[in-house]
């Protein structure tokens, strides 16, 4: 052991060229840390001390300004500090800063499928929001696996992130290790869009049951009575809730719940493409496709069969993603705005990082919107 301080629970170990820094139970790993921190051969050509000497202020004042920390420094001096730093191409040493401030100004995001247009948009919106507040965001993808969720969580904590946004890959997973890991994280965690029920953790999501209800209710209002549902209900709470909304809308108007019109599909285009063959063999006049990828798989099958929307069958999609611009006619869809989701998720995280979060976990439920376009045919009332 090279250094220890029981008061602040900090210790530094060295194993060969690897330095292990433990801060309140969190382990950070660095190679050749002395060179990194010292910048002896590479890195900054100017130091905080040199900038401070040039502007006539203390190094601590310069550090506060360059790290965007609250301080009582005039606007004129702030401008001078930033001009000198820019002229000398000064780049703050983030590793050294994180050791001093006990924060890395980095956050982590785990999504199930980065190829999904919705999750890609969510990641982009969240990264932008984090950057506006001075945070960098590490974006990772679990491939929908609870085991990979667990491994990525551990990797992000090891790399010293200040908090984690988690979109779980398998909401029905009974993986005790993942539950234990989330419950005992040394940093704040916010579950986004999807959640493991019963886990005490901040959650931000849209009302998926309401979304399924709104989509189906709209089809009913347009005269449709035989409405198929293509949904991922076996491995997804979001899919299960959207299915519940679909069934609620049918019950409200006295239509039967017909299991022959409910079809299972994972949130991937090939899965939806395969399931769509059975959907289109029914007498359904409309389909509620419960995600953008599911809708794309359905559209691929329809195109191959030479069927048109809405002439042969009406479709309501989910997510209202950018992929919609590729198709004619444009798809009527339930919209859950990734930017709104990101804003609320970051708000929960900010409160936790600032110590303003309550002892109980917070749950934020947002209302989706129905975006009416051109993919639903209005049927005569007798249909």
Q: At which residue positions do the language-model features occur?
A:
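Short, solvent-exposed amphipathic alpha-helices that sit
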Residues: 80, 118-132, 211-215, 237-256, ...
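N-terminal helix-turn-helix/winged-helix DNA-binding helices
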Residues: 42-47, 85-118, 122-124, 132-135, ...
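Flexible loop/turn connectors
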Residues: 24-27, 32, 257, 275-383
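Hydrophobic alpha-helical segments within soluble ligand-binding/sensing domains
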Residues: 202-229, 244, 248, 269-278, ...
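An alpha-beta-alpha
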Residues: 213-255, 260, 358-376
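Periplasmic-binding protein-like
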Residues: 161-169, 228-230, 262, 280-291, ...
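Flexible loop/hinge segments that line or gate small-molecule binding clefts
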Residues: 144, 166-214, 255, 293, ...
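N-terminal helix-turn-helix DNA-binding module of bacterial transcription factors
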Residues: 2-104
């Amino acid at each position: 052991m090279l250094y220890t301080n029981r008061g602040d629970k900090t210790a530094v170990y060295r194993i060969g060229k690897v330095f292990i820094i433990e801060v309140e139970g969190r382990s950070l790993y660095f190679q050749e840390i002395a060179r990194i921190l010292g910048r002896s051969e590479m890195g900054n050509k100017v130091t905080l001390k040199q900038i401070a000497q040039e502007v006539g202020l203390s190094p601590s004042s310069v550090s506060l300004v360059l790290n965007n920390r609250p301080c009582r420094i005039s606007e004129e001096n702030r401008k001078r500090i930033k001009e000198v730093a820019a002229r000398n191409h000064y780049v703050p040493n983030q590793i050294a800063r994180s050791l001093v401030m006990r924060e890395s100004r980095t956050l982590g995001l785990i999504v199930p499928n980065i190829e999904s247009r919705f999750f890609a948009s969510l990641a982009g919106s969240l990264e932008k929001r984090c950057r506006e507040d001075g945070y960098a965001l590490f974006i990772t993808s679990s491939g929908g696996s609870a085991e990979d969720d667990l491994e990525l969580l551990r990797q992000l904590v090891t790399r010293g992130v200040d908090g984690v946004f988690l979109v779980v890959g398998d909401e029905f997973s009974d993986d005790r290790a993942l539950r234990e890991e989330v419950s005992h994280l040394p940093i704040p965690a916010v579950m986004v869009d999807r959640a493991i029920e019963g886990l005490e953790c901040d959650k931000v999501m849209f009302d998926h049951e309401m979304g399924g209800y709104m989509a189906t209710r709209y089809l009913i209002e347009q005269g449709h009575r035989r409405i198929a549902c293509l949904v991922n209900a076996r491995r997804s709470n979001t899919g299960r809730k959207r299915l519940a909304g679909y069934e609620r809308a049918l019950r409200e108007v006295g239509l039967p719940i017909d299991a022959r019109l409910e079809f299972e599909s994972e949130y991937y285009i090939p899965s939806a493409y395969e399931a769509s063959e059975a959907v289109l063999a029914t007498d359904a006049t409309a389909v509620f496709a419960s995600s953008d990828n599911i809708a794309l798989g359905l559209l691929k099958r329809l195109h191959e069969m030479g069927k048109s929307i809405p002439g042969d069958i009406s479709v309501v999609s989910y997510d209202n993603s950018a992929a919609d611009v590729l198709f004619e006619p444009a798809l009527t869809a339930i919209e859950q705005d990734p930017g709104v989701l990101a804003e609320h998720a970051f708000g929960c995280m900010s409160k936790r990082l600032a110590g303003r979060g309550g002892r109980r976990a917070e749950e934020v439920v947002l209302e989706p919107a129905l975006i009416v376009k051109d993919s639903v045919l209005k049927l005569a009332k007798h249909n």
